[in-house]
A protein has these predicted regions:
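Regulatory activation segment
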Residues: 31, 44-53
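Residue immediately N-terminal to the catalytic "proton-acceptor" Asp
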Residues: 16
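Activation-loop N-terminal segment of eukaryotic-like protein kinases
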Residues: 25-29
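Protein kinase catalytic-loop region centered on the HRD/HxD motif
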Residues: 1-13
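Regulatory extensions appended to serine/threonine kinase catalytic cores
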Residues: 159-169
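Conserved protein-kinase catalytic-loop position immediately C-terminal to the HRD catalytic Asp
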Residues: 21, 34
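C-terminal lobe helix-coil module of Hanks-type protein kinase domains
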Residues: 55-160
């Protein structure tokens, strides 16, 4: 999935709706990201939207506010998708789409290991870094995310994922 996002981002395309329903596995076992229906071509500036775009359970805080989207919005949605893959549930749920959107904007995401205790430390921190509220605290590129995912395969319990302090701009 991250490799598919990386390919899209290299072509300056922001998906804006990364979620399990938009991930398919071919008969050959290849994972593909689908449904670029609300994708936008990214330019040197960010994408502005007057309406929130994406599926609310996987939506980044900036999308929930109806604001700008860039590659880091896809990274957030990937983090939510990974969270669900690891725990079997999304971190935020509610009776209305607005209630879920507000949680994406305001509430901290619990570490996946709080739900599924067998999640390794490095994977916990990868998910938490992907899902930071401020874009500046997330992975800045999918390439950086992929590097940490690969490292987590060989050093799952190592504490190598660095998350910027809360006061970072």
């Amino acid at each position: 999935v991250a490799n598919g996002m990386e390919a899209a981002h290299k072509h300056h395309i922001v998906h804006r709706d990364i979620k399990p329903q938009n991930i398919i596995i071919s008969k050959e076992g290849k994972v593909k990201v689908t449904d670029f229906g609300i994708a936008k071509a990214a330019t040197s500036s960010t994408i502005n939207s007057s309406a929130a775009m994406g599926s609310v359970h996987y939506m980044s805080p900036e999308q929930a506010r109806g604001g700008y989207s860039d590659e880091r919005s896809d990274i957030y949605s990937f983090g939510i998708t990974l969270y669900e893959m690891l725990t079997g549930k999304v971190p935020f749920d509610g009776d209305t789409t607005v209630a879920v959107a507000v949680q994406h904007i305001q509430d901290a995401i619990p570490a996946p290991s709080e739900i599924a205790e067998d999640v390794p430390l490095s994977v916990d921190k990868i998910v938490l870094k992907c899902t930071q509220k401020k874009t500046e605290r997330r992975y800045q590129t999918v390439s950086d995310l992929i590097a940490d995912l690969k490292k987590s395969l060989v050093m799952p319990e190592e504490d190598f994922v660095k998350i910027a302090p809360m006061y970072a701009q």
